[in-house]
Amino acid sequence: MTQRAIVLLSGGLDSATVLAMARAQGFETYALSMRYGQRHSSELEAAKRVAAALGAVRHEIVDLDLRRFGGSALTDDALEVPTDGASGGIPVTYVPARNTIMLSLALGWAEAVGGRDLFFGANAVDYSGYPDCRPEYVAAYETLANLATKAGVEGDRFRVHAPIIDMTKGEIIRAGIALGVDYSLTVSCYQADDDGRACGVCDSCRIRRAGFEAAGVPDPTRYQAAA
């Protein structure tokens, strides 16, 4: 019997690669995205394209407005998205508890459909400032999942996978290309326009562009005219 996996899918480069990895491992993939009040809808449109291209059995977009809380440059217009390169400490683009919220939604869906594997694109190399992208976080969440669910308590354990957590962006891109990922479908920019074109200057754009250079692969990203 084919095993089912829930894959968190933002529409960006990392999550697209993880979806391809889960599929390559033989999982029947269920993609989960969240409309949480992010600055633009382009990444969700990208998520739809990626889910279709990579054969997700289902793709659900859940609405949960984190703009009501703010606390991040991605959900609060009063905070600017940095364009001067990564700095020390936790970046202002960190969305409070976002991975925990999304993994919890994925956990609920997994238990409902009989899946026991959760995949997400945490990366501790390029995004080392995010507390919910560390290996110890992944291990802790897996422990929680097995303490907080009927399936886990009954011994039908959940597994949380973060397959790109120790990979550089260049390594991620090369792995994705080997698995057939079309990165022109993805949007990574924190402030993409309505057409999905990247700003070219935010930290996410900088890291993405450098990743394609490191991978020795042409960058398919569409940039805004001023980028």
From Swiss-Prot:
Its EC number is 6.3.4.20. Pfam families: QueC. It comes from the Bacteria. Transmembrane segments: none annotated. It is an enzyme of class 6 (ligase). Coiled coil: none annotated. Its cofactor is Zn(2+). One of its GO terms (biological process) is queuosine biosynthetic process. Belongs to the QueC family. Catalyzes the ATP-dependent conversion of 7-carboxy-7-deazaguanine (CDG) to 7-cyano-7-deazaguanine (preQ(0)). This is 7-cyano-7-deazaguanine synthase. The gene is queC.
